């Protein structure tokens, strides 16, 4: 019998993040301005980060503040004496564009840059486990080995394909997608006794052996993401940066029942507009694995 602890920490792991995600506040301001003025061309919402907008002179009411994604100032408070031009709502949508004068803004209304993804060594992870093993060496025709692991793995990104929360990298920290909380493996070999038989009976009844491997493992975490762009970032690489709101505990259902999903999907609802939802990047856990 052996009992041991195994733990690791890793730093500077490869992870992806968006350097040029859509700015939510300018989009929210534009949409509010559209509602106030009735100017439908200023309507802004999901997947609008690469759209172009022109605010006419005097269109911003007195006291209303419009946040700008780029330019010499961070915001403009109405009333505005001159038109304001926005080509894209990302920090680097149009690097040479001055929204206050229109100078350097793409005349075709198409931003110079959309998302700019970087793969940097900024990820972290840790793993802790209790490992127990027992072995019976071959005697009296029997040999077996059993191993049990109770572990937990946490990381910021389980692979470079996992996009970090661009507003807060640490908010992406969650269960590793390959985390298997419990795993039990049992292997055995048994040689049946040799009976003192002869002829046909000897050939049929003697020389039999039985062996096998049994594996029982808890399910992997469920990767949670939202692709409706309610966070107004329009940031999609291998996955989306968006998360829904988790409004109830996750309950695993019977996936073998054709009337069931793998879990109660009603536990997740669309998050607030202009913000990433409160759900963790991964939630424990999906269906387990039984291999006999």
PLM regions with names:
Residues 1-292:
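Short, solvent-exposed micro-motifs at the edges of structured domains
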């Amino acid at each position: 019998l052996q009992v041991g602890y195994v733990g690791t920490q890793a730093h500077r792991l490869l992870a992806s993040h968006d350097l040029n995600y859509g700015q939510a506040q300018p989009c929210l301001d534009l949409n509010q301005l559209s509602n106030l003025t009735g100017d439908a061309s200023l309507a802004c919402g999901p997947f609008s980060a690469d759209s172009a907008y022109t605010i006419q002179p005097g269109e911003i009411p007195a006291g209303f503040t419009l946040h700008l994604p780029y330019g010499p100032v961070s915001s403009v408070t109405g009333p505005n004496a001159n038109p304001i031009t926005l080509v894209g709502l990302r920090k680097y949508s149009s690097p040479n564009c001055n929204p206050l004068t229109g100078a350097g803004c793409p005349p075709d209304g198409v931003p110079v840059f959309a998302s700019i993804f970087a793969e940097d060594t900024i990820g972290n992870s840790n793993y802790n486990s209790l490992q127990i093993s027992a072995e019976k060496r071959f005697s009296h025709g029997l040999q077996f080995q059993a191993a049990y692991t109770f572990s937990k793995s946490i990381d910021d990104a389980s692979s470079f394909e996992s996009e970090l929360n661009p507003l807060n990298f640490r908010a992406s920290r969650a269960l590793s997608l390959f985390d298997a909380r419990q795993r039990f493996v049992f292997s055995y070999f048994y040689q049946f006794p040799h009976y003192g038989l002869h002829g046909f009976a000897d050939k049929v009844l003697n020389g039999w052996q039985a062996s096998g491997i049994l594996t029982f493992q808890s399910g992997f975490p469920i990767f949670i993401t939202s692709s409706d762009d309610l966070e107004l970032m329009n940031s999609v690489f291998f996955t989306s940066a968006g998360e829904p709101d988790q409004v109830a505990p996750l309950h695993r259902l019977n996936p073998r029942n054709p009337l069931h999903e793998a879990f109660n999907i009603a536990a997740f609802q669309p998050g607030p507009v202009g913000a990433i939802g409160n759900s963790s990047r991964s939630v424990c856990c999906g269906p387990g694995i039984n291999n006999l």
